[in-house]
Amino acid sequence: MSSVIHAVNLKIGYSPDSILGEIDNLEIEQGEIVSIVGESGIGKTTFLKSIARLVNPISGTLKVFDTEGVSARGVIGYIPQKLGLIKHETVYSNVLEGAICNESILRSISGFHEEKVIDKVKETIELMNLSDKIDEPVKRLSGGQQRRVAIARTIAQGPKLILADEFLSELDDKTVENVWKSMLEYVTSNNITLVIVEHNIERARLAERCFKLEKNEESDYSILSEVKI
């Protein structure tokens, strides 16, 4: 397997004066499913944003698909806590937005393959069990349904790496089971790497490997280490 995320002596935060966490050595391979746990405010979201290059690392090495710049963004799908959906638009329109934000898909549209994009959008909506809501404005959906729209929008981008921040929150146990099953089928069949932030330990156990961010007694910031849960 090839390395997707490679971090060495990495410090994360929003400025050198407010370092939140340190990652001494981390390797995540293609196709792995990994969870990150830790107390609220410990730096889990900041770590995901650093991987996605939405936040620049303070220091150290962070390579995603063997690059340290923003060029990997096109193959990274990010599901944030705040979903950022267009509430007055339909489910279809929101998922379509995810599909066409990928530059390679835009090129395929100009090459008269628009029907492939439409098929991809509909398949992704079906994967998240939203076909009966396809023409509904997002604002009319429940919180759990809106979260499934956000997941579908990310999948429609065709990413090789998915970063999911509490992506199972606001879902009841049965829906969690169904959404996780659909996500697992998708990432395993497409050899996609999935990194999830979770506060729920039972849900974190669904991953193959788990890492914990926790305060280091010798410093003011947290340290990432692999744990068994």
Model segments located where?
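Helix-to-loop junction immediately C-terminal to a conserved catalytic motif
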Residues: 52
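Catalytic Walker B motif of ABC-type/P-loop ATPase nucleotide-binding domains
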Residues: 162-165
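Conserved ABC ATPase "signature" region
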Residues: 108-133
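Conserved ABC transporter NBD signature motif
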Residues: 60-74
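A short, flexible loop at the N-terminus of ABC-type nucleotide-binding domains that lies
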Residues: 1-7, 11-24
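Conserved ABC ATPase signature
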Residues: 137-141, 145
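Hydrophobic anchor residue at the start of the ABC signature
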Residues: 151
